[in-house]
Amino acid sequence: MVHAAFCGISHETNTFVTSALGLTPRGPGGFEPVVGDAVLELSGSYLGGMMSAADELGWELTGLLFANTQPSGTIADAAYESMRDEIVARLRDAMPVDVVGIENHGAGVAGQSA
């Protein structure tokens, strides 16, 4: 059986906004990541579509981490690194994995402190 893991960090960054996003309650203040099995409950997104297709194929699904928030300033380095590190740690714990489905927003920018 194919084992697939799913994750992503999705954010429309506006680099002209001076404040950076951290890990705070969802909304204009920052990210509130969804982790583990809760990721598998997400739908209505690219990630949800990938998971639905994988489920229809009979694959084993593992949720890692998914985070998104409203368009705003850059992602604080500490927030990005925390989410990245959790994705990597959860992926290591889930191994062996055959496929990783990732929903990342191409306009996401990290690089400031919150």
Predicted features along the sequence, with ranges:
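N-terminal amphipathic/basic leader segments beginning at the initiator methionine
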Residues: 1-57
